[in-house]
Regions:
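Small/polar loops that bind or transfer phosphate-bearing groups
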Residues: 150
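Active-site core segments that coordinate phosphate-bearing ligands/cofactors
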Residues: 1-146, 154-172
Length: 172
């Protein structure tokens, strides 16, 4: 399995034949033509757009590495969001949208940058785990590794969370 991790995340596999099944369509997997007649069988998942937005809201005061470190310090914060929820596509204020989502769903509301970041990173890792499980169900195969490429491959904490959530080795 690979994740092309950036503003958006593309998660999937490369295969020789497309999967045009109803189940594949229902789970939002797509087939993109690739090199030598292969297909990239992928799912588009919210990526680091949420973290990028939160960072911009504080005038880029922190580097992505600093945000990762703050998130790791707040790793026990319990709240989660559905990172693919439409409310996160283009909110007026991502920080407030994350807080509002937690409030609406009866969860603890994050207050610090670290808490907000850990909610986002953990929620993304859980989205990746769900997509990996769907991919395995659709293909009838089990995958032991996830290869992360792109700018998000530098988000060490997210990669650790992804390994934990999926039970797979993550190589970035």
């Amino acid at each position: 399995i690979y994740i092309s991790s950036g503003t958006w995340s593309l998660m999937g596999i490369e295969r020789k034949t497309p999967d045009c099944s109803l189940k594949s369509c229902e789970l939002n997997f797509t087939n993109e033509g690739g090199y030598e007649g292969r297909f990239r069988y992928i799912k588009n998942i919210m990526g680091l757009w949420m973290i990028q937005s939160v960072r911009h809201e504080v005038n880029d005061r922190y580097s992505f590495a600093e945000i990762c470190a703050m998130a790791e310090e707040a790793k026990d914060f319990p709240s989660r969001v559905d990172a693919n929820d439409e409310c996160f596509l283009s909110p007026e204020n991502m920080t407030e949208e994350v807080k509002d989502y937690c409030r609406r769903t009866g969860q603890q509301v994050p207050e610090t940058m670290g808490e907000i970041a850990t909610v986002i990173y953990t929620s993304l890792a859980e989205c990746y785990a769900k997509a990996a499980k769907e991919l395995e169900e659709l293909t009838g195969r089990t995958y032991s590794r996830i290869h992360v490429v792109g700018g998000g491959s530098n988000a060490g904490y997210l990669n650790e969370l992804t390994a934990k959530a999926t039970g797979k080795e993550v190589h970035a």
